[in-house]
Swiss-Prot record:
<comment type="similarity">
    <text>Belongs to the globin family.</text>
</comment>
<dbReference type="GO" id="GO:0005344">
    <property type="term" value="F:oxygen carrier activity"/>
</dbReference>
<comment type="function">
    <text>Involved in oxygen transport from the lung to the various peripheral tissues.</text>
</comment>
<dbReference type="InterPro" id="IPR050056">
    <property type="entry name" value="Hemoglobin_oxygen_transport"/>
</dbReference>
<dbReference type="GO" id="GO:0072562">
    <property type="term" value="C:blood microparticle"/>
</dbReference>
<dbReference type="InterPro" id="IPR012292">
    <property type="entry name" value="Globin/Proto"/>
</dbReference>
<comment type="subunit">
    <text>Heterotetramer of two alpha chains and two beta chains.</text>
</comment>
<keyword id="KW-0479">Metal-binding</keyword>
<keyword id="KW-0408">Iron</keyword>
<dbReference type="GO" id="GO:0043177">
    <property type="term" value="F:organic acid binding"/>
</dbReference>
<feature type="domain" description="Globin">
    <location>
        <begin position="2"/>
        <end position="142"/>
    </location>
</feature>
<dbReference type="InterPro" id="IPR000971">
    <property type="entry name" value="Globin"/>
</dbReference>
<keyword id="KW-0561">Oxygen transport</keyword>
<dbReference type="Pfam" id="PF00042">
    <property type="entry name" value="Globin"/>
</dbReference>
<keyword id="KW-0349">Heme</keyword>
<feature type="binding site" description="proximal binding residue">
    <location>
        <position position="88"/>
    </location>
    <ligand>
        <name>heme b</name>
    </ligand>
</feature>
<dbReference type="GO" id="GO:0019825">
    <property type="term" value="F:oxygen binding"/>
</dbReference>
């Protein structure tokens, strides 16, 4: 999915706010995904799935850090996420259907925490960005 100049502007405007609270927002999004879609837990057999557990907040921070890295390379998301794509496709073998689930939950969390900043244009841009990242992360699956 091609990101327009306007999309990139909105992503660059909101990502620093999300990244500043990566453990909190990423943890909330992960917790929501695990709660609403229990099958996603299978890839994390040793996790404590309680709200604000150390494993969930740590995983959430990794997710947001990776998204922030991608946001810093909007003209080369595939290149900036290549190693992470390899990890998910070849080592972790995560179900590619899980990426859109986490993306949806991250949109919910961002909308809750930034209601004024999360206007329709930002919503559209962030949704396109997360879809692009999901596509990149699943590009090496067969």
């Amino acid at each position: 999915m091609l990101l327009s100049a306007d999309d990139k502007k909105h992503i660059k405007a909101i990502m620093p706010s999300i990244a500043a609270h990566g453990d909190k927002f990423g943890g909330e999004a992960s917790y929501r995904m695990f709660l609403v879609n229990p099958k996603t837990k299978t890839y994390f057999p040793s996790f404590d799935f309680h709200h604000n557990s150390k494993q969930i907040t740590s995983h959430g921070k990794k997710v947001v850090d990776a998204l922030n890295e991608a946001a810093n390379h909007l003209d080369n998301i595939a290149g900036s996420m290549s190693k992470l794509s390899d990890l998910h496709a070849y080592d972790l073998r995560v179900d590619p259907g899980n990426f859109p689930l986490l993306a949806h939950n991250l949109l919910v969390v961002v909308a809750m925490h930034f209601p004024k900043q999360f206007d329709p244009a930002t919503h559209k841009a962030l949704d396109k960005f997360l879809a692009t990242v999901s596509t990149v992360l699943t590009s090496k699956y067969r």
